[in-house]
Regions:
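Short amphipathic, basic-aromatic surface patches that mediate peripheral association
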Residues: 291-307
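Acidic-leg catalytic submotif of subtilisin-like serine proteases
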Residues: 1-32, 163
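C-terminal subdomain of the subtilisin-like protease fold in secreted/lumenal serine endopeptidases
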Residues: 163, 208-290, 306, 326-335
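Extracellular S/T/G-rich loop segment that most often corresponds to the catalytic His/Ser-adjacent loop
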Residues: 13-15, 122-207
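Beta-sandwich interaction modules
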Residues: 334-342
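Loop/turn elements at helix/coil->beta-strand transitions in domains of secreted/extracellular proteins
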Residues: 5-9, 52-57, 72-77, 102-107, ...
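Subtilisin-like peptidase catalytic core
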Residues: 14, 28-95, 136, 216
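C-terminal edge strands of extracellular/lumenal beta-sandwich accessory domains
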Residues: 219-223, 278, 308-309, 317-320, ...
Length: 372
């Protein structure tokens, strides 16, 4: 199987894991432990290492711009902490957007846990970063969103989270301990931070299987969205402002590692589109089979922070036998996704249309098609 071999990953976290509980041979401590040894950090590292046991995990202090230059093998990372709980797109969100845009590293962020029943449910910072993949929590025994999993979109109005997955993990054979803050680690962890560590581990495994996705966060996000095929029972009733079909299902590895076709376009702002469109054909289509297609693109955080909107608005259209079979044309999202069944065996004509363009930022556009 695929185990993250050859892949480096980062965790941004002020606490440190207890070394007797984790695999220290695949763990590199690059920062001082500002919060000492913590239950939370131990749990995050355990989940990641269980999911991608051969990946090397580099720990950085909490922050949105880890200095990864000295470790070029780092391809993926995760942030399982939160800063702000309101609707504002903050400097931390901007900094993470810039980090992903400049370094081409796929970064996962926790959607956040709503601890108060009267709270606002806004996705927490830095999970509002548009280039990041924000992860909601699903209870594995019901396949429903956790009641505490945050879902409300920021002032930018882009849909968050983009994915949601299992958030409850148990390591019954781990030795219990009391951490440096007086909290007891008992091998059990639950929350969106756990789902985030798990997602980063899954992506490390994908990079092991398909190196093509390395250094392409725009394709990685499209892949995670199209691979979210296992339906979440209460997705529509839980996430009230997500009208797209992202984060309505759980990513399954079999639908990330197999049965997909991917491509990307990269260059200066004026590249890649003929007029306002990119048009191509998908062949070997099978009638009545299910297809999911997503596009995703990266943007500079500074523009989003200044203008509170996306610098490029790109839409997705799928045509078969001269008829538009599916389309997704949101105005605020940095991704589009469609889910449909083929009407015939005819080729699909894919049209990616840049509906609006500020002229700011490069074209960094990823595409993925999944088929059952």
């Amino acid at each position: 199987g695929y185990n993250g071999s050859g892949i480096g990953a980062y965790i941004a976290e002020n606490g440190c894991p207890k070394t007797s509980v984790i695999n220290t041979s695949n763990f590199v401590q690059t920062s001082t432990c500002a919060s000492g040894v913590t239950k939370h950090a131990t749990s995050m590292v355990r989940i990641f290492q269980t999911t991608a046991p051969n990946a090397v995990l580099y720990q950085y202090a909490q922050g949105e711009s880890p200095n990864v230059a000295s470790y070029p093998q780092i391809e993926v990372g995760f942030h399982s902490y939160f800063i702000g709980e309101d609707s504002a797109y903050k400097t931390n969100d901007r900094n993470l957007d810039n980090f992903i845009y400049v370094n081409d590293i796929t970064s996962f962020v926790a959607a956040g846990n709503q601890t108060s029943p009267t709270g606002s449910f806004y996705v927490t910072t830095p999970g509002k970063a548009l280039n990041a993949i924000t992860v909601g929590g699903v209870y594995p025994f019901t396949n429903n969103y956790e009641t505490f999993s945050r879902w409300k979109n920021s002032q930018i109005n882009n849909h968050k989270p983009e994915i949601a997955t299992y958030d409850y993990f148990s390591f019954p054979n781990d030795a219990n301990f009391v951490d440096d803050n007086g909290e007891t680690y008992n091998g059990t962890v639950q929350g969106t931070s756990a789902a985030t560590a798990f997602s980063a581990g899954v992506m490390a495994d994908v990079f092991h299987q398909h190196p093509f996705f390395k250094h392409h966060p725009e394709m990685a996000k499209a892949l995670m969205i199209t691979g979210s095929t296992k339906m979440i029972g209460n997705a529509t009733s839980h996430d009230l402002d997500n009208s797209s079909i992202a984060a309505h299902g759980i990513p399954l590895y079999e639908d990330l590692g197999w049965n997909t076709r991917s491509r990307y376009w990269r260059g200066v702002n004026s590249c890649c589109f003929t007029g306002d469109s990119i048009v191509f054909t998908e062949s070997s289509i099978i009638k009545a089979k299910r297809y999911r297609i997503a596009i995703s693109w990266l943007m500079p955080g500074g523009y989003i922070y200044m203008n509170k909107t996306i610098p490029q608005d790109i839409d997705l259209f799928v045509v078969q036998d001269g008829v538009t079979l599916a389309y997704s044309n949101s105005a605020k999202n940095p991704f589009e996704v469609v889910d449909f069944y083929a009407n015939s065996n005819s080729d699909l004509k894919i049209r990616i249309k840049r509906y609006a363009n500020s002229g700011t930022g490069n074209v960094v556009l990823g595409y993925n098609m999944w088929y059952e």
